[in-house]
């Protein structure tokens, strides 16, 4: 039985992870869970899955959760970053699933790696901001980094049993988001509610906005570079509106291996939790007669400049990707609060990148300092 700790159990990926566990009680045990502030749902999860530890990032909410707990439930309630670090490095945990949004996942992930705990990674910002550092640590401590993103899970599976020296290119597929086919002039006054309507996937608010700007795909390009050790010029993005092919690998002999399946995040979650094995599931099976046509097109970098910015940051190296990520987090939050427009997101990111003095091969402290600088700088830009 695998023992699991989940960072972000009340979010979209966290809830779907618990769906997988719920259907396979004999295979998995939940040791610890965490949330930012949604203690009502967290309490329901505690009652159902009976973890030994829970962390609430907002300390006042952690105190409130303690008051809400039924007297017959024994659980250690922790708070803040310290709490996340503790539940990420418990001796009894086999797999840490990181499903928190943003930079908050980096330090706990490194804590888990140093304890030799395998990582089921749904928090792409960890590799975007500190990919080189994280992968070196994973190699040092002999830890598996198991991707939960559908695209990276697909590539991971396509590489199984293959020699990485034979990779010619990685091909990440993108749905194109809710605005595929639109031009810039049509998107200037777009609202958050329109941007949140993803055509194929059930996702959280932040990642839904990232999908609408194609920043999500840009972050995935950076993540793929570190996860699979492939240079950026060998990572392509192709828009595939049906989201049936989740990604592909082209080899030096011209062969392409692809991973297909119905759009369901529970599949890559389950694979990450059961790796290197596969486990039966009740997930929907492919009916090829329903998909008589699979289409592909080039991404429109003029309409969706965030993808281009991500490629540029990867090429420049150093801490540029960290600035890209941090600025984007701030700007997406502002957009979701109706404080800025859709195209303010790439505009302010570019302005922040222009003044950044990059650090090559940054330490953890330098990455965290870059994150703080970027957030403060872009917040100040918006105020002006």
From Swiss-Prot:
Keywords of this entry: Isoprene biosynthesis, Manganese, Metal-binding, NADP, Oxidoreductase
Disulphide-bonded residues: none
Annotated binding of Mn(2+), by residue: 149, 151, 220
InterPro entries for this protein: DXP_reductoisomerase (IPR003821), DXP_reductoisomerase_C (IPR013644), DXP_reductoisomerase_N (IPR013512), DXPR_C (IPR026877), DXPR_C_sf (IPR036169), NAD(P)-bd_dom_sf (IPR036291)
A GO biological-process term: isopentenyl diphosphate biosynthetic process, methylerythritol 4-phosphate pathway involved in terpenoid biosynthetic process
Record Pfam families: DXP_redisom_C (PF08436), DXP_reductoisom (PF02670), DXPR_C (PF13288)
Needed cofactors: Mg(2+); Mn(2+)
Gene3D superfamilies per UniProt: 1.10.1740.10, NAD(P)-binding Rossmann-like Domain
Any one GO molecular-function label of the UniProt entry: manganese ion binding
Binding-site residues for 1-deoxy-D-xylulose 5-phosphate, renumbered to this chain: 124, 150-151, 175, 198, 211, 216-217, 220
Entry annotated with the keyword Metal-binding: yes
Pathway linked to the protein: Isoprenoid biosynthesis; isopentenyl diphosphate biosynthesis via DXP pathway; isopentenyl diphosphate from 1-deoxy-D-xylulose 5-phosphate: step 1/6
Catalytic activity: 2-C-methyl-D-erythritol 4-phosphate + NADP(+) = 1-deoxy-D-xylulose 5-phosphate + NADPH + H(+)
EC number(s) reported in the record: 1.1.1.267
Binding site for NADPH: 10-13, 38, 123, 125, 204
Free-text function comment from the UniProt entry: Catalyzes the NADPH-dependent rearrangement and reduction of 1-deoxy-D-xylulose-5-phosphate (DXP) to 2-C-methyl-D-erythritol 4-phosphate (MEP).
Family: Belongs to the DXR family.
PANTHER family noted in UniProt: 1-DEOXY-D-XYLULOSE 5-PHOSPHATE REDUCTOISOMERASE, 1-DEOXY-D-XYLULOSE 5-PHOSPHATE REDUCTOISOMERASE, CHLOROPLASTIC
Protein name: 1-deoxy-D-xylulose 5-phosphate reductoisomerase
Organism: Clostridioides difficile (strain 630) (Peptoclostridium difficile)
